[in-house]
Amino acid sequence: FLRNFRDDAILKTKTGSSFMAVFNAWYYSFSPVVAQLIQEHSTLKTAMRIMLYPLIGILRIGAEAFHLVPANMEVAAVVSGVVVSALIGVIYLSTPLTAILAYSSRIRRAANRLQLPVTLAFLGSLASVALTVVLGGLIVLMMFSTSALVLASLTASALIASQLILRLLSRR
């Protein structure tokens, strides 16, 4: 299912194929070594399987989000990418970030100061993606813009979730 979604939907768009080119270059720069290490240690293999289950669910949700925007595949790919990135940020990054922010008030203040820059990075990268789709042919800018959008989505969602969790905990 997920491979078909990637190949038949995401890679058929400029935004999706641009992001996947960057993602694959990053991912395959380290994954063979990690895969070998996991293969050699059964405990690590079990732990990685458990850690990947939420990711599979997140990717399925992203596929559903893609199909909510049937009129334009480029917009659908961006929506799917933002949904997936935001959920990855919430599921995988917000827990350790919450622990770090709860431990250090200095880091918490720094995180609060990041809200505006992260929001601007998200909006700027979204505008850049839209502009490169409209102008076409700017593959390097599209690769940069889609990657920046994913990173901004990850960061924003993790920050927001962590700060919400801390607020809820402080009310107790």
Please provide the spans of the model-predicted regions:
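Long, compositionally biased charged/polar accessory segments in the mid-to-C-terminal portions
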Residues: 1-172
